[in-house]
Curated annotation (Swiss-Prot):
PROSITE patterns: AA_TRNA_LIGASE_I (PS00178). It comes from Photorhabdus laumondii subsp. laumondii (strain DSM 15139 / CIP 105565 / TT01). This is Tryptophan--tRNA ligase. GO terms for molecular function: ATP binding; tryptophan-tRNA ligase activity. L-tryptophan binds at D146. GO terms for biological process: tryptophanyl-tRNA aminoacylation. The keyword Nucleotide-binding applies. The gene is trpS. Keywords: Aminoacyl-tRNA synthetase, ATP-binding, Cytoplasm, Ligase, Nucleotide-binding, Protein biosynthesis. It catalyses: tRNA(Trp) + L-tryptophan + ATP = L-tryptophyl-tRNA(Trp) + AMP + diphosphate + H(+). Homodimer. The keyword ATP-binding applies. ATP binds at Q22, P23, S24, G30, N31, G158, I159, D160, V197, K206, M207, S208, K209, S210.
Length: 345
């Protein structure tokens, strides 16, 4: 089967989607249900570009050996979740230098005050007070370059990245106002039915791979038995008699368990409420633990299949980077001409 040319790809009718994940920690079941599973569903209807954003990862100090391992782990997880290199462009950010090249130019069209207002910079600065570096401050501009260099139409974003996407739109519109229609202005993609998985011990906050309390987190690569134990210890509430019902305000812990079970089994929340009517919270926890541990076991089998084949992983990275570079260079050439750089002889 012949690969489409760059011009054929760019002229396709499918909207272009870009998204990525950092290889800086273990991906969680929250990442899977909220993002990766949505990415898989989008592959047939969108022109999908999925990146492993290793350059973003080093805004926080990384062990080099561990970063290389986690980059390959993340790629294998992408594949295990169902992201298909025949349908999507999959690559590692540092393999495509056009991201960093465009990022520098966009820095010159981004204001200090805009970056100062980014809440994620404030949060990360507080957590990493010993290493408040320029890259951490400038992170949203590299994210903007990641998006704009592919003429992205839609970006799947969570609440924590919504402010960054708004900045990306502002930068694109500002640049276009000066130089003409150079960039597509990206829109947020709001997935339907994507569960927002919350922390098991603190169900009013989102599950995060960087959470210091590991009892809050279910990693995709952790021992399924460990995951089951965490679920059985998850916070519920003290309602008497116990009622298994979905109520984010009054019953965040129970609602989170129902979201998890719905996400894994495909059942609706009303179906699950009916199924557990009159039952104790322990019954719900056992059902969630069994479903999640079963899902993790199957996912990890697929992960190890891909992770143990580094020849295949290297091939996918090389082919993905080649496709991404060709597409990114088209945009970069337009930008270079617009700002007045002399074409490379």
């Amino acid at each position: 089967m012949n690969e489409p040319t760059v011009s054929e790809t760019l002229n396709s009718q499918k909207p272009i989607v870009f998204s990525g994940a950092q290889p800086s920690g273990e991906l969680t079941i929250g990442n899977y249900m909220g993002a990766l599973r949505q990415w898989v569903k989008m592959q047939d209807d969108y022109d999908c570009i999925y990146c492993i954003v290793d350059q973003h990862a080093i805004t926080v100090r990384q062990d080099p050996k561990e970063l290389r391992k986690r980059t390959l782990d993340t790629l294998a997880l992408y594949l295990a979740c169902g992201i298909d290199p025949e349908k999507s462009t999959i690559f590692v950010q540092s393999h495509v230098p056009q991201h960093a090249q465009l990022s520098w130019i966009l820095n010159c069209y981004t204001y200090f005050g805009e970056l100062s207002r980014m809440t994620q910079f404030k949060d990360k600065s507080a957590r990493h007070a010993e290493n408040i570096n320029a890259g951490l401050f400038d992170y949203p501009v590299l994210m903007t370059a990641d998006i704009l260099v592919y003429q992205t139409n839609q970006v799947p974003v969570g609440i924590d990245q919504k402010q960054h996407l708004e900045l990306s739109r502002d930068i694109a519109q500002r640049f276009n106002a000066i130089y003409g229609n150079i960039f597509a202005v990206p829109e947020p993609f709001i997935p339907t039915g994507g569960a927002r998985v919350m922390a098991l011990q603190d169900p009013e906050k989102k599950m995060s791979k960087s959470d210091d309390n590991r009892n809050n987190v279910i990693a995709l690569l952790e021992d399924p038995k460990s995951a089951a134990k965490k679920i059985k210890r998850a916070v519920t509430d003290s309602e008497e008699p116990p009622r298994v019902r979905y109520d984010l305000e009054q019953k965040p812990g129970v609602s989170n368990l129902l979201d998890l079970l719905a996400g894994v089994t495909g059942k609706t929340i009303p179906e699950l409420e009916a199924e557990f009517e009159g039952q104790m919270y322990g019954h719900l926890k056992s059902a969630v633990a069994d479903a999640v541990s079963g899902m993790l076991t199957e996912l990890q089998e697929r992960f190890h299949y891909f992770r143990n084949d580094e020849i295949l992983l290297n091939k996918i990275m090389a082919e993905g980077a080649a496709k991404a570079k060709a597409r990114a260079q088209i945009t970069l050439d337009k930008v270079y001409e617009a700002v007045g750089f002399i074409a490379h002889p």
